[in-house]
């Protein structure tokens, strides 16, 4: 619950402080109330913005063959059981980019989005490692703080530069390395995630083109392989790049 508590406190304190400066106490209280409601709705809103097709044993996106979809479902259901997330779901984004992201305001409402390009690129062991990484975000509460950073702070960064730093703090600059470690603790096979990250690092496209520009920009730091807000280039200063994350995993 710690990441959730910290995220809520930062949202309320940040927005209330700015409101006091701009419009006084009454407006501050009103905005604080709205931001609290935003927390409740944030993950659902972000999930709808991302879109994708839910993948189950009975349903698959056209981009995946029956065999590919069955492999994805089998791996996902096994990890749902290990993590204790029976209510989680997998959605596939029909896009050649190779990336994944997770959202959800609580563990029993988590959603993992994975691009079709990544599903087709990875073998079963690598796919398991990537899904474990994203489910670890859900279990750690990273998806809550990430959703709040996107919906509460990102729209304000254009007008108040300080909010760019606040958004990054709320999202968590160290979220990916910690999720890497949590994933290999579950799979007990670091080479699987190492191989997946190396393949992603060597792929030409990280930024999904199926997303609107605003959604891609606001979520850029929340993906398995973060990318620059304005381009497909890897994320800049403050983010641990994939090669560094691989180096950490090799030490295990």
Language-model features, listed with the residues they occupy:
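An active-site-proximal "capping" alpha-helix that borders the catalytic cofactor pocket
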Residues: 76-80, 172-189
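Active-site-proximal gating segments in proteases and membrane effectors
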Residues: 82-109, 164, 184-252
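Catalytic Zn2+-binding segment of zinc metalloproteases
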Residues: 135-151, 190-191
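Hydrophobic, aromatic-rich membrane-embedded alpha-helical segments
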Residues: 149-166
């Amino acid at each position: 619950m710690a990441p959730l508590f910290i995220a809520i406190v930062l949202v309320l304190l940040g927005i209330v402080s700015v409101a006091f400066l701009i419009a006084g106490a009454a407006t501050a209280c009103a905005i604080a109330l709205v931001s609290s409601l935003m927390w409740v709705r944030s993950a659902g809103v972000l999930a709808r913005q991302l879109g994708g097709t839910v993948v189950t044993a009975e349903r698959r996106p056209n981009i995946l063959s029956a065999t590919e979809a069955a492999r994805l479902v089998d791996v996902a259901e096994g990890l749902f059981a290990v993590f204790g997330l029976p209510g989680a779901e997998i959605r596939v984004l029909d896009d050649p980019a190779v990336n994944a992201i997770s959202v959800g305001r609580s563990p029993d409402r988590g959603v993992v989005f994975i691009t079709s390009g990544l599903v087709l690129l990875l073998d079963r062991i690598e796919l398991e490692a990537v899904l474990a990484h994203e489910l670890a975000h859900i279990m750690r509460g990273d998806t809550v703080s990430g959703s709040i950073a996107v919906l509460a702070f990102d729209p304000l960064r254009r007008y108040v530069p300080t909010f760019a730093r606040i958004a990054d703090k709320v999202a968590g600059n160290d979220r990916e390395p910690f999720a890497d470690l949590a994933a290999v603790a579950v799979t007990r096979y670091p080479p699987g995630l190492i191989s997946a990250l190396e393949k992603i690092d060597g792929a030409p496209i990280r930024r999904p083109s199926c997303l609107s520009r605003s959604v891609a920009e606001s979520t850029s730091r929340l993906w398995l392989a973060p990318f620059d807000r304005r381009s497909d280039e890897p994320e800049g200063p403050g983010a641990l790049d994939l090669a560094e994350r691989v180096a950490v995993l090799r030490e295990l």
